Amino acid sequence: MITIIGSGKVGGDAALFSALKRLDDQILLLDVAEGLPQGEAMDINHMLSEQGIDVEVKGSNNFEDMKGSNIVVVVAGSGRKPGMTRMDLLKINASIVKSVVENVKKYADDSMIIPVTNPLDPMAYITYKVSGFDRSRVFGMGGMLDLSRFRQFIHEATGHSRDSIRALVIGEHGENMLPLPRFSSVSGIPLPSLLPKEKLEELVQNTKQVAAKVIELKGATVHAPGNAISAIVEAVVRDRKQVIPVATYLDGEYDHSDVTIGVPAVIGKNGVEKIIELDLNDEEKQVFNKAVENVKGALSGVEI
């Protein structure tokens, strides 16, 4: 069973995409708001009935119902409002995530946890520490969403098929993210061979800023994060051994320890099966290190 804690727009879309991909026979939507997960589940099930997809989506307000879950996605918390940064949400969401993870420990202690709540990297750290799970079983969704946005900008700039584009974004899921043109390509051709430096810099900045633009225009980002969640879940349940940037706990990798930050990792049935260390240049290291310090600084004022 896949459990998604938080039944708002992103949680609902994550359940929808996961059901359409048939990632499990049972998907549970959990939320403290009476009626919300039940109504969301009903709506999705009606769609699945027309599609002929035999996945059962259930809504509940009882944490005990997550017993037996293989994967728990944590989306619970307050979302960004126009003008807010992800870090503005830290104090609001830290206590919510801690409470949720305590319940995951109690009722689904064999599961993997995928934190999604913003600010993502600090929340992934809190999840890892509070759960006490092995680091392979706690990995946050951040870079997967960022690279989908980076891919879209590459598609718009080159005109090439989205399917031919491979992109990579690491670091903080926030203002200090690190889109990596050197490690991105179109049909195997390195991106710097296709676009001038000025254009690459423009794509990087657009990738960093586009979420705020979407929030300004429609109030929230919904479909892209919902799909990114399902893509990570799919890598686990299908044992894809797929290289995905996830927020995972570092213990010496990239010369950093005791921090959770976005890095490329092999994701399969055992969760984070291997962390891949890239040969970053000095400029890239500077941005990555700044992201690490930002996450550590944010957590310094949080009691775990």
From Swiss-Prot:
GO terms for biological process, alphabetical: lactate metabolic process; pyruvate metabolic process; tricarboxylic acid cycle
Residues given in the record as substrate binding sites: 80, 86, 118, 149
GO molecular function terms attached to this record: L-lactate dehydrogenase activity; L-malate dehydrogenase (NAD+) activity
Record flagged with keyword Oxidoreductase: yes
Active-site residue list: 173 (proton acceptor)
UniProt KW keywords: NAD, Oxidoreductase, Tricarboxylic acid cycle
Enzyme Commission code: 1.1.1.37
Sites where the protein binds NAD(+): 6-11, 31, 93, 116-118
Stored Pfam families: Ldh_1_C, Ldh_1_N
Catalytic activity entry: (S)-malate + NAD(+) = oxaloacetate + NADH + H(+)
SUPFAM superfamilies: LDH C-terminal domain-like, NAD(P)-binding Rossmann-fold domains
Role description: Catalyzes the reversible oxidation of malate to oxaloacetate.
Family the entry assigns: Belongs to the LDH/MDH superfamily.
Name used for this protein in its record: Malate dehydrogenase
Organism of derivation: Nitrosopumilus maritimus (strain SCM1)
